[in-house]
């Protein structure tokens, strides 16, 4: 009986020690460092309105249905963060072709002046998470005609807005040139006032 107790005692102590270290101490240290070094990112890169209410995050896409605003990427999960992920079909999968064809038809319905050959791929395909907040500058530019007609804002102003909101690759190396749709639409909203 004593031998069992002598074997179990260190096992229980080690288990409890690692439970406290990995489940409490480490997360608190990492959270503290994140809050000190990059508070905005640690809090989810939230964007607030004039009333200090959260209206979105720079990191999570939103579904903009009003045709006066720029539209983001297609999301098979309807931008529900708790259901993150998409059906990442292989290029040879017929379901991918059907989904893209449906996305093109939906997009053409809202933007009849844009030829199918000029629709950027990021407007008719999902991102891996289904929550991508960014589109390419070209994807924003092809929407200028529609938005200009609906808002009476000159195309030149809208193109300048896109240029002002365009972000380069991270550190000049990683990723593509992109436009955050939420930030772009907030800037557009200021022009509409």
UniProtKB/Swiss-Prot annotation:
GO cellular component: plasma membrane
Keyword field: ATP-binding, Cell membrane, Ion transport, Membrane, Nucleotide-binding, Potassium, Potassium transport, Transmembrane, Transmembrane helix, Transport
One of the record's GO molecular function terms: P-type potassium transmembrane transporter activity
Domain of life: Bacteria
Transmembrane regions: 14-34
Location relative to the cell: Cell membrane
Membrane topology reported for the UniProt record: Single-pass membrane protein
Entry-linked Pfam families: KdpC
Subunit structure: The system is composed of three essential subunits: KdpA, KdpB and KdpC.
Function according to Swiss-Prot or TrEMBL: Part of the high-affinity ATP-driven potassium transport (or Kdp) system, which catalyzes the hydrolysis of ATP coupled with the electrogenic transport of potassium into the cytoplasm. This subunit acts as a catalytic chaperone that increases the ATP-binding affinity of the ATP-hydrolyzing subunit KdpB by the formation of a transient KdpB/KdpC/ATP ternary complex.
Family, per entry: Belongs to the KdpC family.
Full protein name: Potassium-transporting ATPase KdpC subunit
Chain's gene name: kdpC
């Amino acid at each position: 009986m004593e031998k069992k107790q002598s074997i179990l005692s260190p096992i229980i102590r080690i288990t409890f020690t690692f439970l406290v270290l990995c489940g409490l101490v480490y997360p608190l240290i990492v959270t503290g460092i994140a809050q000190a070094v990059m508070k905005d990112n640690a809090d989810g890169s939230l964007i607030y309105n004039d009333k200090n209410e959260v209206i979105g995050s720079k990191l999570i896409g939103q579904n903009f249905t009003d045709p006066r605003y720029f539209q983001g990427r297609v999301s098979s999960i309807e931008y529900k963060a708790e259901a993150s992920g998409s059906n990442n079909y292989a290029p040879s999968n017929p379901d991918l072709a059907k989904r893209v064809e449906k996305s093109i038809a939906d997009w053409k319905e809202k933007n009849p002046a844009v030829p199918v050959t000029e629709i950027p791929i990021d407007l008719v395909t999902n991102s891996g998470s289904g929550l991508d907040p960014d589109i390419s500058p070209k994807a924003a530019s092809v929407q200028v005609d529609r938005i200009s007609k609906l808002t009476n804002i000159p195309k030149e102003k809208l193109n300048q807005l896109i240029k002002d909101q365009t972000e380069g690759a991270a550190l000049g190396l990683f990723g593509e040139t992109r436009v955050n749709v939420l930030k772009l639409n907030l800037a557009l909203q200021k022009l509409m006032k």
